[in-house]
Amino acid sequence: MSKIIGIDLGTSNSAAAVVISGKPTVIPAAEGVSLGGKAFPSYVAFTKDGQLLVGEPARRQALLNPEGTVYAAKRKMGTDYKYKIFGKEYTPQQISAFILQKIKRDAEAFLGEPVTDAVITVPAYFNDNQRQATKDAGAIAGLNVRRIINEPTAACLAYGIDKLNQTLKIVIYDLGGGTLDVTIMDFGQGVFQVLSTSGDTHLGGTDMDEAIVNFLADNFQRENGIDLRKDHSAYIRLRDAAEKAKIELSTVLETEINLPYITATQDGPKHLQYTLTRAKFEELIAPIVDRSKVPLDTALEGAKLKKGDIDKIILIGGPTRIPYVRKYVEDYFGRKAEGGVDPMEAVAMGAAIQGAVLAGEVKDIVLLDVTPLTLGIETLGGVMTPLIPANTTIPTKKSQIFTTAADMQTTVTIHVVQGERPLAKDDVSLGMFNLDGIPPAPRGVPQIEVTFDIDANGILNVSAKDLGTGKQQSISITATNKLSKDEIERMKKEAEQYAEQDKKAKEEIETINNAETLAYTAEKTINDAGDKIDESSKESVRSIVKDLRDAISSKDINKIKELSEKLTKEIQEIGTKMYQSQATQGTSQNSSQNNNSQNNNGDTVDADFKESK
């Protein structure tokens, strides 16, 4: 059986690894390791003569060919964005596929055998569309993607391979080029389980580069009256120098930044020269690193843990090599971070271990990921009814019984949504389909079983089945919307910000739904009762029902509550009179009538679907 390689498909840089003789080994790029230990920079370039460049060769020529170079395509995965390059269009999947093809070729050269299968990692916050897009990119590259796993989960595998007999609470602090992911995991008896995830979608190494760029540019402007940031070529040179300085200051106390002929004036060429110390660098990045506190606090809160409960700290991503970053995280938790694995390589190595597990080369490891956001369907009144809560371990399958909202309803619409808001309109629509052919029946009678099934890659399949007829429809959620990692984080923040407002809105909808059900039940009760209820009682009920429906139409919540209470009391009084009347008719009739008046209190969720028009 051929090897299953592990691939860390990153925003700034990618990496790959494979398990050889039981140990994960990093796969080198054909060009060797570049600046800062980067094997496969996530750059794709097209030259004007039609040549395709990928990785370090593409990165090196980016300054001279900006219009033909694509960088950070990962941010566009799962969207319908198109890159327009020299008259041709490319999807993010195609761009990512070029990087994966490069990794595949170099892996085959390294191993001396064909490579067909891979495990690819994605950020913990990637939604169904983004995960599917990643699988599609693998397929375009000629790879059979055996599994999509979360990056922090892969990192845990890289560190946990030799610790199979311990029970641990682990925090993974993954600081990359543009994002921070904080994940807390439980590890025991070979099982990795995600407890919580958090992050900042605009915090990473590029922010540090930009801080250095701004500092140097401000200095240069004060001395020469020229803002280098307004000159594209000068800015690119400055940014490259800033990144180089950042990397060097992880191991030395000062570094020389020397950019001759950075610009020119009427007086001649201008040069930039500056000695940047580690102390000054740490001063520049301190506000950036301090932004880690909120995601760290949020992750602990989500896992219901305290700082002292954490047993291990794992640092992932190039910026975590910076001593100041490492010290910040260690000081936060009051313990030392783990060593022994290169932060730039850990994710790829963990993916390789998962590949070896799938290939049967490594035993006794079970991987349990979670879904990042709540999944559910839209029900009557626009309410989002959850089926699978956020942070549920996957793979998972959940079913729930729903019913119709109107008499003689023959079609229901299943609207699948994802998010943390109580109302479906505030969440993200993932897909919609109809279940037709439901036999006509009074509202509340049909039983529709809705099933959510998430596979090990986080891909969602939804089905709806009429239990009466056996008819079934389903949908597989693929890359059809534009929910990005930024939007996921925004949605979580909005859920907190609008919690009280959402609660009130949901309560109002539930009040209206309950009132409609009450009005329907009241009318049905007096109609079914016939002459067992006197006409004055019937007229009283009809009058209240009319007023209640008027209040529902005008959405007068206080009036709805008042009339609902009044109608409930009226129905109870009628029920009492009917019972007393029946009690005088003998034991047999009494028993029969009691059976007929029983309520159906099964698990069916009443009146949850609008009729499809």
From Swiss-Prot:
- Any one GO molecular-function label of the UniProt entry: ATP binding
Q: Which residues form the signal peptide?
A: none
The scientific name of the source species is Picrophilus torridus (strain ATCC 700027 / DSM 9790 / JCM 10055 / NBRC 100828 / KAW 2/3)
| The keyword Chaperone is assigned to this record | yes
Q: What is this protein called?
A: Chaperone protein DnaK
For this protein, the record's InterPro entries field holds: ATPase_NBD, Chaperone_DnaK, Heat_shock_70_CS, HSP70_C_sf, HSP70_peptide-bd_sf, Hsp_70_fam
What does the function comment of this entry state? Acts as a chaperone.
Q: Which UniProt keywords apply?
A: ATP-binding, Chaperone, Nucleotide-binding
